[in-house]
Amino acid sequence: TNGDSDISVDGTTLTITPPANYNGSEDVTVTVSDGVLETSESFNLTVNPVNDAPTVQDVAGTTAEDVDFVLELDGTDIDGDELTFLASVSANGSASVSGSTLTVTPDADYNGTLEVTVTASDGQGSGSGLLTLEVTPVNDAPVILGLEDQTIDEDTSLTLDINGLDVDGDALTFSATNGDSDISVDGTTLTITPPANYNGSDD
């Protein structure tokens, strides 16, 4: 018998199992009996401490496209050791840790799921958890490609093919305005007709 440890005897084999994460000293009393009389002896059992690796819980988070996600990390170490943290992203982003503050930066214009592995270390052992980060889409404004200054002669029209890019893959429509010239857009074709006898510069 003893205090909190689990003790079993099988024939002449004594097995002692201390509680999880226990360390310290305890007395064990062994009794032998012949069915009529019994004798007891005690001995002291010392359980030496060993390092227990920290743990990090799995968590989930949400952020918008092109917006950093910031989280205060919280690991558990039953030994009370000071923890340091590291983080890595499987793809489509990057992660950095300052103290216990995690910052996850999705790649530009990315939306979808990021998996971030967070590791806590106590200097002797480590444990990891997974942050599942959902990056929600936002609309990105389209851009016009290859539009440069143009020169034409008086009393002539200018026709240009205009091109745009939308990273979201949305269908694009074009329009154009200026001062006194007549402007029309047909699909991706821009036609500019200055007034008769006009010369000069137009924006």
Model-assigned labels for residue ranges:
Residues 1-52, 62-141, 148-203:
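Acidic, turn/loop-rich segments in luminal/extracellular domains of secretory-pathway
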Residues 56-58, 145-146:
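Short structured motifs
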